[in-house]
Amino acid sequence: MLANSGPDAKQEIIRQAAVYASGVLSMAGDPALQQLVEQAAREFQVPIAALSIVDRDRQWFPACVGLDMEQTSREISFCAHAVIHPDQIMIVLDATLDPRFSANPFVTGPTNIRFYLGCPIRDRDGRALGTLCVIDVTSRARVTEADLDRLRDLARHAGDIILQPEVSARDRRQALDGISGQIEVLIRDGEEDGVDELDAMLRRLERQEERDRQRKS
């Protein structure tokens, strides 16, 4: 069985490979991303804003405001729900009334989440790497279309920042290993029809590696 079994398990494996291929896992503390989440917190007038990358077992925050943690387990992540639908913004007006989150420790504990708005950050193929989210400790009655449009713009900018640089040689090797492992999982579980997409990611990274070698020669 796939690690994230369910109707979309194969696509989740491919999405995780896209996270590796993007190079975002090496972008902790990136100043441009930090400025962007600070801007989001100001514009939405919330105490918490974060860029959350959803990996296999965790969500990780390369940039955030109002959180004193670098990562959490995926099983309590709001953003893990948001990446399931990469073309939609996830809206939670009052987490205490949402059966997905009412017992979540981020809701019942000191973080005290009530309002959550999370827009998927997508790679060039439309796969969600994570989200840009804004969070409040008080519930809200509604969000406006202008709010949604603004968060989409900020999330699109975050994606541009993440995808702009080429993946470094070290991170590329880590990505190649990670994607190769994902291919093995698909083959093991009889999902060979997803291998072509992962193989295309591998080829893109290998072309980068070849360009690096040519520049150095």
Locations of regions flagged by a protein language model:
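Glycine-biased flexible loop/turn sites that connect beta-strands or occur in inter-domain linkers
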Residues: L51, G126-R127
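Amphipathic alpha-helical "output/dimerization" segments
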Residues: V143-D160
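Regulatory sensory and allosteric helical modules in signal-transduction proteins
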Residues: A18, I48, V54, R58-C64, ...
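Signal-transmission linkers at sensory-effector interfaces
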Residues: M1-P31, R170-V185
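Short amphipathic alpha-helical segments
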Residues: G29-R42, I76, S180, D199
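A short, aliphatic-rich beta-strand micro-motif
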Residues: R114-D123
